[in-house]
Swiss-Prot record:
Residues 378-441 form the TRAM domain. Its cofactor is [4Fe-4S] cluster. SMART domains: Elp3. Residues 143-375 form the Radical SAM core domain. SUPFAM superfamilies: Radical SAM enzymes. Keywords: 4Fe-4S, Cytoplasm, Iron, Iron-sulfur, Metal-binding, S-adenosyl-L-methionine, Transferase, tRNA processing. The keyword Lyase does not apply. This is tRNA-2-methylthio-N(6)-dimethylallyladenosine synthase. [4Fe-4S] cluster 2 binds at residues 157, 161, 164. It holds the Pfam family TRAM. GO terms for cellular component: cytosol. Catalyzes the methylthiolation of N6-(dimethylallyl)adenosine (i(6)A), leading to the formation of 2-methylthio-N6-(dimethylallyl)adenosine (ms(2)i(6)A) at position 37 in tRNAs that read codons beginning with uridine. It catalyses: N(6)-dimethylallyladenosine(37) in tRNA + (sulfur carrier)-SH + AH2 + 2 S-adenosyl-L-methionine = 2-methylsulfanyl-N(6)-dimethylallyladenosine(37) in tRNA + (sulfur carrier)-H + 5'-deoxyadenosine + L-methionine + A + S-adenosyl-L-homocysteine + 2 H(+).
Amino acid sequence: MSKKLHIKTWGCQMNEYDSSKMADLLDEYQGYTLTDDATEADVLLLNTCSIREKAQEKVFHQLGRWKTLKDKKPGLIIGVGGCVASQEGKAIKDRAQCVDIIFGPQTLHRLPEMIDQVQRGEKVVIDVSFPEIEKFDRLPEPRADGPTAFVSIMEGCSKYCSFCVVPYTRGEEVSRPQDDIILEIAQLAEQGVREVNLLGQNVNAYRGATHDDQICTFAELLRLVASIDGIDRIRFTTSHPIEFTQDIIDVYEDTPELVSFLHLPVQSGSDRILTQMKRGHMAIEYKSIIRRLRKAREGIQISSDFIIGFPGESAEDFADTMKLIEDVAFDHSFSFIYSARPGTPAADLPDDVSDEEKKQRLAILQDRITQQAMRYSRQMLGTVQRILVEGPSVKNPMELRGRTENNRVVNFEAPHTHIGSFVDVEIVDVYTNSLRGIFIRGEAEMDLRRSLRPADILAKHKQDDVLGVTQFTP
């Protein structure tokens, strides 16, 4: 009888990526297969996020539900990972006696050893250390799951914004070597991946080592990824304005694989609040980046993060944020009411904006951005859009679902043989969260660059030096 693994994931795309790696790791090394049913699992893993309010209590509520499963099945192993585990490991150990393993984002690669330790009789195994980038060296080869894939290029953040826990839970910025990233993406492309999303807490701070002891910048990495045959779209998440340099903007001018959509968090439009947040830039500098981006790539659409009701935020500060939203014409946003994160400098500031005021401001902001997004969507009516077909439509499995470059979901009728490929569709209807399209043509009628398999590229560029050391240059 096969061993079963259940993973519950909260939070960002990095957590989603980490959870997929946990599943691959435990499948390859210990034979665990994933299940959606927690009641049939032999190992339960909770991958946590500490960004939202009351994150710790949310963890304990979930563990309480899992404790009832363990009471019925004493051999069940429960593990807690992610940012809450990194930040609150001792509290979890003290309060949740059902937990066997506590691990941080940088130690998930040690899960097989931790499970072995528990099975040998150790009571609670804890490892929330930051062992540089070691975890990537010990993860199995990537497995594609559809035509899109996340690829982590770096970990941590060194910006220390006053409201943010990431430097304390994931550590400071550490970049993966350039060759490791290129090889992983080439392997994914060979399995049918057409779009990659490069992940990091601050991807534009990427500075990865090369095989000849040089440093690869983020702009250089983007061009290298674009050169991998079969990869026709590149996205990345997320960025910080202070390191969105001109060389990155230049890539938008000459690299069509990089999509015309950018998520660039600003958090506030008030210079006073930006200073309090320790963001390191002013609103005018953010607008300068957007202006240069739109000069390099006409029609690029921008999304952002906003924190509403940061300590000391006045009506004037909020008005500055709304002015920035109007000036930039954001297409989408992730906007949140401020709540203090324990251990951050902002947690020591008086939380002096009332809950009612925060909610009102959030509603105003979200309504404005929804209006702007609908305006962009209506402009797409009658246009032909290139869609990467991701799978069947959620609401109607007989139809197909894909995404435009600007990250809009499109539903349309076409044969399921198009899943995993590009199609052109005409946009005929607009809804709040999706578009409706009519199939125009399939990939066979397009001039897409797929003359070589990634394996051929690797073989062509792989050379052994006189010491027998293999080097790969894309």
